[in-house]
Amino acid sequence: MNIAKHLLFLSAGALLPAAAQDAAAEKLAALQSGVTAAQTSGDNAWMLVSTALVLLMTGPGLALFYGGLVRKKNILGTLMQSFIMMALATILWAVVGYSLAFGEGSAFLGDLRYFMLKGVGGDPNGDYAATIPHQTFMLFQMMFAIITPALIT
């Protein structure tokens, strides 16, 4: 009888660490998902701030810089060149540019997988940026598609 009590006590004690490990594993999983969510939102916020900074560098920054390089009578024309280039590059990027740059195709030219931004949503794209939404990645890349021809004008 005494041995049976000890076996019962030992078997109950053996179950306690397993239950504690399960609870600890659940807490650890919850903490990891919280850290991942915080990291993802932080990454997204930084990418959006960076996108806005590049847009400001193109819009008022580059337009005013070029406006200061010309004579007084040509300032508006020079400013409008920069702003029209921004509008045109945005439309072209949304229609075909992103798809040709980042679609799956050859090593030099993508396919029309993302034509008119079809399939570009809020979920991360594991091929390019695993912690930010696909839309944020597309916007960030679009800013450089905007500023590149604006630098040439």
Where do the protein language model's features map onto the residues?
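Hydrophobic alpha-helical transmembrane bundles of multi-pass membrane proteins
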Residues: 2-153
